[in-house]
Amino acid sequence: MTRFALLVRGINVGGKNKVVMTELREELQTIGLDGVETYINSGNIFFESASSKAELVDLLGHFFRDHYPFIQSFSLFSAEDYAQDLASLPAWWQEDLARKDVLFYTEGLDQDAVWELVSAFSLGDEIIHRGNLGIYWGKYSEETYTKTAYHRQVLKMPDYRLLTIRNANTFDKIGQFLRKS
């Protein structure tokens, strides 16, 4: 059995796209996922499965289309995938920056095209790293946050809706859930 994280985008935000996590956990168990757990109400789901990632992407895609049609994109990765990305993070990720976020790639996203766009941004008081799971973004100063490419340009990206963003604290919590057995 492999432990997976499933990150869904845009649920329970501002009273829109409401999902009751206890119901979602039960529904995911009925389609064959084991040990389903959630963390906060923003779409951080953890489970175990003997199925391949490709099989799970297909299964979950059909499940969301049938039961939660507003969930149109999600990120799925294993505990091993997470550990590999964590091991390759640059030193600045461990520094005490004003803000740190991960822009997780969702399934089917053209990661190269997104990176090409993001890496061309004129970065101000910020730094980025391309990981296998997403783009790691650090902002050095809270005072200059509104002037950063992150604040000004990410929302305008054509593929913005195909990214799901988590802050560094949630990224760390994802790791804790993935290490459970």
Segments (PLM) and residue ranges:
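Surface-exposed, charge/polar-rich loops and edge strands
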Residues: 2-42, 46-181
